[in-house]
């Protein structure tokens, strides 16, 4: 197994369209040291179903759509271990278009992903709480 890689873990919040609290998009950005590839995980709707997407070598910090971010500290993990954990996070696909009450949102998936990282021993319960609380605060800065 390759050695673990150091990443700085960020919870990224992006403007929605329209920018409402239920349309703001969330991703987990694993920022690598200079010269190493970054990794971003998020879920997005594809043909009315949520799908996991991994972006490598994408620098989420350079997006013009960032509305806020939460630093969750450093994490030491191999990209393969990270992939296995992210792929294990349940994706819920509710039927309907009511995004306000949709448990299948990227926001809820991100909370479950943080909990999966905690269960695997990569982050602490305090970091999970800080991530979820920070996400909720930034998301609710949007118009209702």
Kindly give the residue locations of the regions a language model identified:
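Non-catalytic ligand/cofactor/substrate-binding and regulatory segments of enzyme domains
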Residues: 2-104
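Activation targets extended, charge/polar-rich intrinsically disordered C-terminal tails
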Residues: 90-144
């Amino acid at each position: 197994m390759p050695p673990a890689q150091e990443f700085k873990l960020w919870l990224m919040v992006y403007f929605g369209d329209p920018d409402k609290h239920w349309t703001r998009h969330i991703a987990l950005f694993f920022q690598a040291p200079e010269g190493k590839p970054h990794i971003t995980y998020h879920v997005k709707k594809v043909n009315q179903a949520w799908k996991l997407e991994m972006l490598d070598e994408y620098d989420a910090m350079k997006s013009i759509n960032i509305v806020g971010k939460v630093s969750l500290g450093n994490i030491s993990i191999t990209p393969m271990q990270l992939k296995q954990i992210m792929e294990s996070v349940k994706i819920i696909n509710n039927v309907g278009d009511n995004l306000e009450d949709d448990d299948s949102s990227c926001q809820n998936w991100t909370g479950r992903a943080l909990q999966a990282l905690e269960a695997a021993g990569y982050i602490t319960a305090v970091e999970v709480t800080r991530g979820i609380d920070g996400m909720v605060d930034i998301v609710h800065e949007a118009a209702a």
